[in-house]
Amino acid sequence: MGTGKDGGGYLRAYNGEGDESAYVGTGRMGGGYIRTYNNSGRETSYLGTGSDNSGQLRIYDKLGETRSYIGDGYLQAYNQFGERTIFLGTGTNGGGYLRTYNFSGQESIYVGTGADSSGQIRIYDNSGETGSFLGSGYFRTYNRFGKLTTFIGNASDGGGYLRTNNKFETETVFLGTNNANEGLINLNDKFGQSFWIRLNKKN
């Protein structure tokens, strides 16, 4: 127990080997914090005030590498390679969201609030490109070239429909409700030209 160079008080605890195991005190910026250490002298946790004057909690692995972080409205987790794997928090627009990342730090999933304040889910492929999207009354899938391949959702007039596209994003199939609120099936060739259509049971 004592007073540091900056005038702040502190308390240190030691294990049976005489190694420091905990520190409670005041930092250089005037904020308070607690640090704990393992029997190898590696820091295992930090609870206190960060450089931005907000509160934070850091959890470290046995080697002293950050594994999780909570602070300023969000939580982050890291793998053994130091790559972020999870982000849970609040976006700049005030909406909450969750992001997950693969072992190399590339985003794999987004679940949360979109720019239009509606809920959405995005699934990314191993190249970081959107593979599928669910939100605002529709579902979309994309191929590895970023081209839209499937759409299931609501039309502007309230009817539901399914569209499929080829790898060049040219429409090949339409199955759904037309403007007359009747069922419609339309098949197109690879150039998007219709070659078979069924409007109702009489045609």
Predicted segments with their positions:
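Parallel beta-helix/beta-solenoid repeats that form elongated, surface-exposed shafts/blades used
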Residues: 1-203
